Regions:
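Extracytoplasmic gate region of multi-pass secondary transporters
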Residues: 1-54, 141, 145
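Intracellular juxtamembrane helix-capping segments at the cytosolic ends
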Residues: 105-118
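A late C-terminal transmembrane helix in Major Facilitator Superfamily
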Residues: 117-154
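Multi-pass alpha-helical transporter architecture, strongest
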Residues: 163-191
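Juxtamembrane helix-start elements in MFS-like secondary transporters
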Residues: 31-40, 88, 92, 123, ...
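Helix-to-loop junctions at the C-terminal end of transmembrane segments
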Residues: 51-62, 149-150
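Cytoplasmic membrane-interface "Motif A"-like loop-to-helix N-cap segments
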Residues: 60-71
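C-terminal ends and interior cores of transmembrane alpha-helices
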Residues: 73-86
């Protein structure tokens, strides 16, 4: 459950922005349709970069450390989105790029993380179960955005909620370490 919750928390920020990147660019920053389309492409590009680079990073510093770093950077990216406003293209692009990298990091690392935890034998089934966290985030992220816009007339408050999810994800990386340490201690004692 910790891993499913971690994936959900880690994916919320990306799914908040991916689903509404063009409307965010137009409404918050005042971008034209063409410029908003470029913002969507930028998010997609950084998503791909996150998938590739996070895999390389996780091989060096470990999967859970990489996911913790992605949660931490998501907080930064969401903060940049929160402070961006009309005409503030640079801050918006910094935020959307960081969020893209972090979202890609979760998508790139989680299959290997699942295999490391449960073994390769049933990885397709196990990752399918883990992916339920992504499905939940796919509902929660966009819902936060649309409900915040309806309630306040702005997307800004949604980024604060996204930050709370990223903080929860960061805390879950510590919970995972604690649970995993206890499980490994029990398994070692049984040998």
């Amino acid at each position: 459950y910790v891993m499913i919750s971690l994936l959900m928390c880690g994916a919320v920020a990306g799914l908040m922005c991916i689903s509404l990147a063009s409307p965010l660019a137009k409404k918050m920053i005042g971008m034209s349709v063409a410029s908003a389309t470029a913002a969507v492409s930028t998010l997609a590009l950084f998503n791909v970069l996150g998938r590739i680079s996070a895999g390389l990073i996780s091989d060096k510093i470990g999967r859970i450390n990489t996911l913790a770093l992605a949660c931490l950077l998501s907080i930064v990216g969401l903060y940049f989105m929160y402070i961006s406003g009309e005409g503030d293209v640079r801050t918006f692009y910094i935020g959307i790029s960081i969020i893209g990298i972090c979202f890609g990091s979760f998508m790139g690392v989680f299959p290997g993380f699942t295999a490391d935890q449960f073994g390769a034998k049933n990885n397709s089934v196990n990752f399918g179960i883990m992916f339920s966290g992504f499905a939940i985030a796919g509902y929660v992220g966009p819902t936060i955005m649309t409900n915040t816009l309806k309630a306040t007339g702005s997307y800004k408050g949604a980024f604060l909620i996204g930050i709370a999810f990223s903080i929860a994800g960061l805390l879950l990386t510590f919970a995972y370490r604690s649970v995993n340490k206890k499980v490994n201690t029990i398994l070692a004692a049984q040998k």
